[in-house]
C-alpha cells in the first residue's frame, strides 16, 4: 500500500492560501505530483493512504481540493484505503457536501469494510450540524441491513440526534427498526426517549414511552423524572402527574425529596389545602425530612391564600429543623402582608428571620412552573441584576421594596 507525503510543506500551505473555486484541480494535481504517488502511476490497481492530507484539507475548509485528489488518483487506478475513505466522507460531511459524503458512505457500506462506530458517530454529528436528519435515518437503515451487530450503538446515536432536535417521527422510526430486528433498548437509551418525548411530544406519547421503560423493567432516572414532571406541570395535568409519581414509587430515597415535593406542588397549584396538608403528613410518616423546597411550596400556597397562621407555623417548623429561609421564603411573607395592606405587621415576622444574610434562591425551579414568582421575588431579582456589586441583604431588599410600594401608592392617590 502506498502513502502520500503526510506533511504539507511551506510551499504547499502557500499554494492552498491561493485557493479559488476554479483552482482546485490544479492544486490537487500539484499536491499529487510532489508526493510519492507521482512516481507510481501504472495500469495496476493500487491501494493508497492519504487520510492525513484529507484531514488537513478538511480543517482548512478545502473539501473541493480533497475531492479533486480523490478523482485524479482514482482515475489512474490509485484507490483510497478504508482510512482515507472515512477521512474523505467526514471532510465532505463536515463542510456541507452531503451528496459527496453519501457517495463515499455507500461505497463503504457496500464493500467488505465494516464501518467504525467512532467514524459513524462523527458522521452523524456532522449531519446534525447541517440538519440533514434524513441522512442519519439512512445510515441507521443501512447499518440494520448490512451490519446488524452495530445497530444497538448506531441506533442510540441516531435516537440522541433525533430526540434533541425534536425529530420524533424519525426517532420512532429507529425504535421500530430496532423492534423489527429484535434489538432491545438499553436502559440509558430508553430513558432518553422518555426525556425527549416530554420535551417535544404529547403527554400521550410521553406516557407510551414511559410504558416501554416499565415493560422492559428499566428504572427511570432522575433527569427523566424531572422532565416528565415538568411536562405535566406545564399542561396543569396534576392528577396524571400524581398517578405517574405514585407509579414511580414515592419511597425512592436516592431521589431525595423530589417526588414528594412534586406531589405537594400538584396540590398547592390547585390550592387544595387539605390535600396538601395530608400529603405533607404522609411524607413525614414515610420517614422523609422536609427541605427548603418542601416548605416553600407550602409557603407559596399559604401566602396566595392569605393563610397567615399556616405561614407562621411553616416558619416555626423551619426554625426547629434549622432550615434557613431563602428569597422565596421572604417573598411569601412580604407578599402575604403587603397584599392585605399589613406592612406595619411585617417587622414582627421578619425580625425572627435571617434578615442580614445575602439573598439566595435555593428553591427547586419546578416550584415556579405553576406557582410563579411573587412580586417581592421578581422585584428583588431585578434589583440584584441592576446593581450586583452592592452587598445586598434581605433587610436592604425589603427596604427598597417598601419604598417602591409607598411611592407607587402616593402616585396613585395623587391622580
Curated annotation (Swiss-Prot):
PANTHER family cross-referenced by the UniProt entry: OS08G0520200 PROTEIN
Record organism: Arabidopsis thaliana
Name the record gives this protein: Pentatricopeptide repeat-containing protein At3g42630
Family: Belongs to the PPR family. P subfamily.
Upper lineage: Eukaryota, Viridiplantae, Streptophyta, Embryophyta, Tracheophyta
Keywords for this protein: Repeat
UniProt keyword Membrane, yes or no: no
Gene3D superfamilies tied to this protein: Tetratricopeptide repeat domain (1.25.40.10)
Superkingdom in the source lineage: Eukaryota
Swiss-Prot/TrEMBL PPR repeat ranges: 46-80, 81-115, 116-150, 151-185, 186-220, 221-255, 256-290, 291-325, 326-360
Listed Pfam families: PPR
